[in-house]
């Protein structure tokens, strides 16, 4: 079987009427049909990208007239907004709520992954803070483990401390950041910008998934975060 490798090419997007290629009357074998379908797909995609590109350019032109700062500052502010809008659209395209409404298993796994990510983030954050203050973290780990277990997260108990089995990074952040970086790489050149986009990605994801928790006994990500913060503050405030 012939292996076809597609290599990326740099090209300029131009607004034009896209006309899908017509299938020839001869050589109607399966390989030809597959290649034709791929070509037509990319023609349509090219047209959609052209429209989106022109839309962004028009937005830039109209918004710049209302900006009171320097030209460079205006471009920076506008571009950040465009990147964030792109990330928001990417999140809508993932359609977490739609997939969850059709697949209960997906909904359950999403809730567990989100709460496990909250647990992992704040466990690391507060453990580092407590250690810096010379506070023993063992009681803290035991208590937040119990909170995670009470929240309904699956996991295992080791050395009398419960740990969620899915603890780790938020699984939806990477697709948003990766897609935005691929389209706007020049906006990810500084650590400050990267951190800003990561914070924004996490924010819109947490807002998007809240409805998934409305019909279950699990706390929302925001409620679970507050539970972990309250536990940590108890140990911090008791520091001599």
UniProtKB/Swiss-Prot annotation:
One of its GO terms (molecular function) is GTPase activator activity. Keywords: GTPase activation, Guanine-nucleotide releasing factor, Secreted, Virulence. Residues 78-240 are annotated as: GEF catalytic domain. It comes from the Bacteria. One of its GO terms (cellular component) is extracellular region. Its main location: secreted. Gene3D superfamilies: SopE-like, GEF domain. GO terms for biological process: actin cytoskeleton organization. InterPro entries: SopE (IPR005414), SopE-like_GEF_dom_sf (IPR035949), SopE_GEF_dom (IPR016019), SopE_N_dom (IPR016018). It is found in: Secreted. Encoded within a lambda-like prophage region with similarity to GIFSY phages. Acts in concert with other proteins to mediate cellular responses leading to bacterial internalization. Activator for both CDC42 and RAC1 by directly engaging these Rho GTPases and acting as potent guanine nucleotide exchange factor (GEF). This activation results in actin cytoskeleton rearrangements and stimulates membrane ruffling, promoting bacterial entry into non-phagocytic cells. Belongs to the GEF (guanine exchange factor) SopE family. This is Guanine nucleotide exchange factor SopE. The lineage of its organism: Bacteria, Pseudomonadati, Pseudomonadota, Gammaproteobacteria, Enterobacterales.
């Amino acid at each position: 079987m012939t292996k076809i490798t597609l290599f990326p090419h740099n090209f300029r997007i131009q607004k034009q009427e896209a006309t899908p290629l017509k299938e020839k009357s001869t050589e109607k074998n399966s390989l030809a049909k597959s290649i034709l379908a791929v070509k037509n797909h990319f023609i349509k995609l090219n047209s959609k990208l052209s429209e989106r590109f022109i839309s962004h350019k028009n937005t830039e032109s109209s918004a710049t007239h209302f900006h009171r700062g320097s030209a460079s500052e205006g471009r920076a502010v506008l571009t950040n907004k465009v990147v964030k809008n792109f990330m928001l659209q990417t999140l809508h395209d993932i359609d977490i709520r739609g997939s969850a409404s059709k697949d209960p298993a997906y909904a359950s796994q999403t809730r567990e992954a989100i709460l496990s990510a909250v647990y992992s983030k704040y466990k690391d954050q507060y453990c580092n803070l407590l250690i810096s203050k010379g506070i023993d973290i063992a009681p803290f780990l035991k208590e937040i483990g119990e909170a995670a277990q009470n929240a309904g997260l699956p996991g295992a108990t080791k050395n009398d401390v419960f740990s969620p089995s899915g603890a780790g990074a938020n699984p939806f952040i990477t697709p948003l950041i990766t897609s935005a970086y691929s389209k706007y790489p020049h906006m990810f050149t500084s650590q400050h910008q990267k951190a800003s986009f990561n914070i924004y990605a996490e924010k819109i994801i947490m807002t998007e998934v809240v409805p998934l928790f409305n019909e279950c006994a699990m706390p929302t990500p925001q409620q679970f975060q507050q539970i972990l913060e309250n536990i940590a503050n108890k140990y911090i405030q008791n520091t001599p």
